[in-house]
C-alpha cells in the first residue's frame, strides 16, 4: 500500500510540473502570441489559412456554433462513409468488410463527439485506412473543437462590450497545429521506443511456444492513434482490449506516459484559464476543487480494489486482481481508472466490469458529475465554469446580492444557458437507461443478473450520455437499439452544452465589468472551493443516487453473503 501511495503522489506532482508550462504555452497560442514553435509553424499556418480561405474576422455565437456543427457534420459523413466502404478502400490487408449502417452510425457519432464509445473490436473489424484516416483524424479535430470552444468561453469573460467570441477556423487550426500535433508526435515516438506497434504490415501468423498452435498477431499504426487518443481525451483503443493490451501499453513506463497524457491538457487548461483572466488564484481555486475530488476518488477505488469485499477477506493479500494486468497491479489500474473517467477519456488498462462494486461506483460517479473533474479537453473546463456560475448564483441568493463572476453580473439568460450545460447529460443518461432496461435486446446484452446487470446498463448509458466512452465489458453493445439511441445521446450530450457555452460566452462578452465591493463573493478562497465541490457533488448525487442504489450500491451488499 505504501508503494501505491508513493506512486500516486509522484504521478500528481509530475502532472502539475508538466501542466504549468504547457498552460502558459497554450495561453500564448490562444491570444496569438509567438511561441518557440512559431518560426517553424507560422508558414504552415499562413498556408493553411490561404488554402481554406479563412477570414480572421470574429464570429458571433450563432456563427461560431454553426461552423462547429457544419464541420462536425462533414466529419460525421466522412467517417461513416469510410467505415461502410472500407472493403473497397486501400490499406486493408486483412480484407475487413464494411460495417453495418447502425454500427457505422454509432462509431461516427462516437468519434465526432469526442466520446470514442466502441461497439466493435478494432483489430477484428477495422482496416488500417479506417483507423488512421477515419478515426485518428477525428481524434485530432474533435479534441481541437473542444479547446476552441473553451477559448471562446474564456474570451467571454475577458472581453468587454464585444459581440463576437473569436473565429472558430482560426482557433481550430492553431490548436491542432501548435498544441495537439507537437504533443502527439513526441508521445508517439516515446511509445514506439517502448514497444508500442506502429506498422502497416499484414497481421503475423506465429506458432505458440506452448503447443505449436498457430496464432494470428494483429499489427497496425497503433502508436500514432494512441498518442492522440490519450492527449485528446478521446479514449478509443486501436485494439479491442484498449490500453490493457500489451501492443498498446506494454509496461509500467508506458502506463505512466498514458496516464499523464490523459490529464495533461485538461489540467494545463486550468492553468491557462488563470493566466487568461489575469488572476492565477482563480485557476488555482478551480484546480484545487478538481484535485480534491480526484484524489478522494483515487483513494476510494484503490482501497476498494486492494481490500476487495467482505466475502473475500482472508482469501488474498494482493487485492482483487480479476480483470487487471499483473504489470500494472491494483495501484496502476486504480489510478488509470480514476484518470480516464475523471477526464472524459474512456481508455482502460483493466476491465471495469471486473472492479469491485464500490471500485466500479467511483468511475461511474465521476462521469455522472458531468465530466467536470478535469473532464474532456475544453469541454471539462467550460462545464466546470457552468458549475462555478451556479455556485455563485446560489451564494448570491443566500445573501441577497446580484451574483457576479470575474466582474460580470450573472443574469437570468446566463442561468438558462448554465442549466442546459449542467442538466442535459444527466437527463440523457437517466432517460436512456430507463428506456434501455425495458428493451428485450438490451436485456439480452447483459451478461450478469441482478444489481450488477443493471450496473452494466447504467454504466453504458452514463458513458455515452457524458461523452466518456468506457464500458463494463459484460455489456454487449453492438445491437441496433444501442447503436442508434447511443449515437443520438452522444451527439446531443456533446453539442447542446457546447452551443449553450458559446451563447453564454457571447452574453458575457457584451457586458461591462463591475468593480468588486466588500459584498462581492470571493471565488478564489477556501470557502468557495468547498461550496463548489458541494454543488458539483450534490447535483450528481441528487440526479443519480436512486439509480446508483439499484446498481453498484446494491451490488456491494451482495458481497456480505
UniProtKB/Swiss-Prot annotation:
Record's protein name: Potassium-transporting ATPase potassium-binding subunit
Record NCBIfam families: kdpA
Topological relation to the membrane, as annotated: Multi-pass membrane protein
An example Gene Ontology molecular-function term: potassium ion binding
InterPro entries, sorted: KdpA
PANTHER family, per the entry: POTASSIUM-TRANSPORTING ATPASE A CHAIN, POTASSIUM-TRANSPORTING ATPASE POTASSIUM-BINDING SUBUNIT
Subcellular location(s) of the protein: Cell membrane
Protein task: Part of the high-affinity ATP-driven potassium transport (or Kdp) system, which catalyzes the hydrolysis of ATP coupled with the electrogenic transport of potassium into the cytoplasm. This subunit binds the extracellular potassium ions and delivers the ions to the membrane domain of KdpB through an intramembrane tunnel.
Assembly and oligomerization: The system is composed of three essential subunits: KdpA, KdpB and KdpC.
Organism: Listeria innocua serovar 6a (strain ATCC BAA-680 / CLIP 11262)
